[in-house]
Amino acid sequence: MVIGVTGPTGAGKSTVCDILRNWTGVSVIDCDQVARQVTEKGTLCLLDIAVEFSPSVISADGTLNRKKLGQLVFSDPEKLTRLNAIIFPYILERLREEIADAEKRGAKAIFLDAPTLFESGADALCEKILTVTSAPEKRLTRIMQRDSLSPQGAADRMASQPDADFYLARADYQIQNDDDTAALRLAVMELQNRLGL
C-alpha cells in the first residue's frame, strides 16, 4: 500500500514520517530528498532549470544554488509553476523506481513524504492520502526556524502553496499537529491502528 503524506509547509509532515520510519515493514520515501537527487550536479534536470531561469542558479561548484532559485520562484507563482513543470517529471520517474525497490524489499506500507503530492501528480501513485495540518502561526514559526527565514520569507513560502483546505478535501486520513511530540506520536499510533499495520 502506498500512502501519500502531504499538507501545507511547516505542518509537520517530515516529523510524522520520522515517526513512521520506526514501524516494522514500513518504508518512507522523502520526496524533498528525491528532488535534491534529481537536481544534483550534472543532472539533466539541473541543466533544464539553468536553461529556463538563469545559469546563476548553478553555484561555482556546479551544484544548484537553492537559495537563489528559491528567491526567484517563491515570490512569483508563474516562475514556481515553470519550475514545477521542469522538475516534477524527473521526480515522478525516480519515485516509481523507489516504490518498486521498497516493494521488492517487502514493505507492507510505503509512505511518500510529499509536500507537492497533488501538484506533482504523485498522488496517482498512492492508494491513500494522509494530510498533516497545523495552525498557521505554528507553521510560520516552524518555517522560520527550519529554513532560517525572516517572517516575510516564511510568509511568502506559505503563500506559494495551497491552504490546508486544499489538502483536507483530498485526504483519506488527517493528523492535526498543534501539540507536543507526545501528542503527535499518539496520533500516528492511532493511524497505525486504522491502517492495520
Model-derived regions: residue spans:
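ATP-dependent small-molecule kinase phosphotransfer cores
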Residues: 36-105
